């Protein structure tokens, strides 16, 4: 150990600077000297390693809403869904208007009379059985059309004391003629006839007995002679009367 310490001290003496003013350097450190002049910048060193990842920053403020994209293609048709339950019953609606078809009908009979009627003139049936619309005039025996359409007219006559021939007349023209011979029988006979005809407003229809001796229409308490008519169907929708 001692030889090693002696060698170490020898090395320190031989490597130390020359003695100044014959002073032996002290083994104790002195006061620090003045800072030296800064050295030149050295060359750039090698790049250092990447540092550790930093912590996540705070969320940024929401950006402005962008423009909508183009509509996509229609998707495939889905399966039908289950049938829904029936909804509640709705409120009752207001009553609608009910269209009533036009009407026209009458029936009348002759009063008791044993006097033969005049020929070639309208024959009055003065006792009204039905005439709700007032289209038949019992004083003249004429029916005047107010509702255009097709009508049916019928006459049922009692024949007594003479043969009878009568016509259904429209506006002065015979549309049907009927005859019953009377052979002097003790009891009355009967004669019936009818026809359908189309009428326009203000057309008139009546019964008229024939000329000569064929005027044997009769009416009494037990036997009647009647004239009736009624509308079968109407052309009211296309008539100016209802425009």
Swiss-Prot record:
* Entry's localization field: Secreted
Classification via InterPro entries: C1q_dom, Collagen, Collagen/C1q_domain, Tumour_necrosis_fac-like_dom
Q: Which residues form the Collagen-like domain?
A: 30-95
- What is the first-listed, main subcellular location in coarse terms? secreted
Q: Which GO terms describe its molecular function?
A: identical protein binding
Which keywords, in A-to-Z order, does the entry hold?
A: Collagen, Secreted, Signal
Query: Key word Secreted present in the record?
Result: yes
**Protein name, per record:** Complement C1q tumor necrosis factor-related protein 5
Recorded source organism is Mus musculus
């Amino acid at each position: 150990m001692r030889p090693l310490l002696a060698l170490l001290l020898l090395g320190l003496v031989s490597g130390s600077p020359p003695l100044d003013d014959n002073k032996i350097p002290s083994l104790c450190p002195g006061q620090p000297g003045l800072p030296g002049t800064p050295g030149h910048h050295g060359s750039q060193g090698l790049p250092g390693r990447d540092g550790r990842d930093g912590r996540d920053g705070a969320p940024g403020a929401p950006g402005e809403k962008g423009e909508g994209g183009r509509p996509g293609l229609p998707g495939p048709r889905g399966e039908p869904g289950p049938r829904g339950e029936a909804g509640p019953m709705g409120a009752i609606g207001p009553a609608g208007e009910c269209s009533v078809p036009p009407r026209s009908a009458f029936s009348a009979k002759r009063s008791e009379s044993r006097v033969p009627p005049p020929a070639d003139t309208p024959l009055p049936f003065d006792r009204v059985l039905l005439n709700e619309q007032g289209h038949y005039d019992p004083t003249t025996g004429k029916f005047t059309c107010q509702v255009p359409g097709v009508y049916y007219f019928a006459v049922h006559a009692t024949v007594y004391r003479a043969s009878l021939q009568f016509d259904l007349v429209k506006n002065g023209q015979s549309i049907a003629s009927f005859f019953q011979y009377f052979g002097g029988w003790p009891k009355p006979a009967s004669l019936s006839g009818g026809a359908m005809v189309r009428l326009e407003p203000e057309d008139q229809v009546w019964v008229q007995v024939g000329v000569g001796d064929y005027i044997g229409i009769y009416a009494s308490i037990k036997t009647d002679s009647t004239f009736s008519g009624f509308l079968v169907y109407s052309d009211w929708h296309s008539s100016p009367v209802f425009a």
